[in-house]
Structures are given as structure tokens and as C-alpha cells.
Amino acid sequence: MAAAIMAAEQEAAKGGGRNRGGVQRVEGKLRASVEKGDYYEAHQMYRTLFFRYMSQGKYVEARELMYSGALLFFSHNQQNSAADLSMLVLESLEKSDAKVTDDLLENLAKLFSLMDPNSPERVAFVSRALKWSSGGSGKLGHPKLHQLLAITLWKDGEGCANMLVEYSSSRGYRSEVDMFVAQAVLQFLCLKNKTSASVVFTTYTQKHPSIEKGPPFVQPLLNFIWFLLLAVDGGKLTVFTVLCEQYQPSLKRDPMYNEYLDRIGQLFFGVPPKQTSSYGGLLGNLLNSLMGTGEDDDTEDGQEDSSPIELD
């Protein structure tokens, strides 16, 4: 099979105008190898072809082959091989002069959405993807990519928690271990996604190596979030008000917390709406684009969501 694939690749190299057809034949032979269950051999052939294409300056062919290969391995639940090819997609973008386009951003978001939430490669992938999409002009990455990634995280509380644990452990300050999950929980609640808010909090506090078993927790902010999730289930405004008053010292650590809580008060406790600014913070950098920051949109959303949610 390897000889047949290499022969097809050599034919593609000679094809000139027929180059795309040759690449498609290579893809077809690789697909057949994967379909037969020859995962290791196919993976190695993908890598061999990638470095050959890159050395020849065929960045587009290298990227497209790795992207289709990653999707193929994902469809066969070969997470390690798929994640490796996904990283090679990024490498092809980083080493070429490829311009940021919607299609490329959507491809990267697709790969991210298929990665195992527990995979350490997921954090590395999203960090490199955001860095590439910034084009060197900013640190946060392209807004379109933020939006696409946010949709995946919004749907997957456990995956979000695992990524936050990995990110906090490898790149965050130990003193801010509680702030990572607080941002995520508060913003999930601002999106009316109570289920994901609970999942991300439980998963994060159980898996983070720097958090002692609770509740109650050593960190006051974690206790506040725990009580807040219970209060949301109860829907009693007096409980919510007292809770926010008692934990003001912890809530002052980030000026955005009270803005989140204003919104949460509107959504779950019937507090009258007030004008708010856009959402921010670690996860908010992703969710901000999803929620929108236009004045007209904010006004309409505020009117639509101002009534309290019916709680059992």
C-alpha cells in the first residue's frame, strides 16, 4: 500500500495542471488504507507526504491533505493520529503566507470541535490557532475564530472545564486558580446555560490539582460560585442578594463579576434590567463574539431576556 501511495504522489508531482487530480488519488489510497484499519501505516504516510509537500513549497496541498486526513481519523475514533494531523494543519499555516479566511477559520474550529476534551493537544491546538489567526497584530486572535470556538465550548461544559484545568495548570498563576472557573460559570449563566455552568464547575473543582476537595472550599470565590448555583436553582432574590453582599471582597477581584451578576439577577431572579457593557475575561474573550456587542442587539436581547426563567 505504501508503494502505491508513493507512486500516486510521484504522479501528482509530475502532473502540472493535473496536480489536484493526483492529490485526490493520493487521498483515495490513504483513505482506503484507513478504511482497512491500517491506522499506523496510514498515519506515517500522511506525515511523510506532509513534509515532502512542505519541502517543495506545496503548502496548500499539505494543508488540505492533513485536514482531510484528520477528519478521516476522527471519524474512525483515532484521536491521537487525528490530533497530530490537526497540528500539522497549523504548522502549514504558520510556515506559509496563508491569509486568514473564513474557510480556514471554520476548518480550524471544526478540528477543535472533534478533539477529545481530555486531550492535552486541544489546549496547544487552540493556543496556536488563535496566535496564527491574529496575524501578528494582536494577542487574542481573530474575532471570527473566537466566535466559532465559543460555540463549541458553550455546548460542552465538561470539555470547557478540562481545557480550563489544563490552561490554568500550565499557564496560570496558582493564586488565580479560582478565577478561571468563576469566569466560565458566570458567563455560562449569562447565556442561560445553567447545565453547562454546573458541569464546568463540578468538573473543574474535582480535577484541578491545586483545588482541595470540597465543598466547602478553601477559596472563598469557589464557595460563592457553589452557593450561586444552588441559589439559581431556588430562584429566591433574597438569597441571591445576601450572597452577593457577603462575598463582595471576593467579587472585587475582577470588576466584571458584578456586571455578570447584574445580568444573572435579571435572568434568574427577576431583577429589573440595567444597561450593561460587553462581557470580558478569559472565556469571555471567546464568548464575547458569540453574544454580540452591538447596541441594537443588546437592547433587543435585554428586552427579550429580562423576564425571570421559570424554575421548578
Curated annotation (Swiss-Prot):
Stretches for region Disordered: 290-312
Acidic residues bias spans: 294-304
Name of the gene this protein is made from: GET4
Keywords associated with the record: Cytoplasm, Transport
Family membership noted in the UniProt record: Belongs to the GET4 family.
GO CC list: BAT3 complex; cytosol
Localization in the cell: Cytoplasm, Cytosol
Name listed for the protein in its UniProt record: Golgi to ER traffic protein 4 homolog
Keyword Transport belongs to the record: yes
Gene source species: Gallus gallus (Chicken)
One GO term (biological process): protein insertion into ER membrane
Keyword Cytoplasm among UniProt keywords: yes
Task performed by this protein: As part of a cytosolic protein quality control complex, the BAG6/BAT3 complex, maintains misfolded and hydrophobic patches-containing proteins in a soluble state and participates in their proper delivery to the endoplasmic reticulum or alternatively can promote their sorting to the proteasome where they undergo degradation. The BAG6/BAT3 complex is involved in the post-translational delivery of tail-anchored/type II transmembrane proteins to the endoplasmic reticulum membrane.
Subunit structure: Component of the BAG6/BAT3 complex.
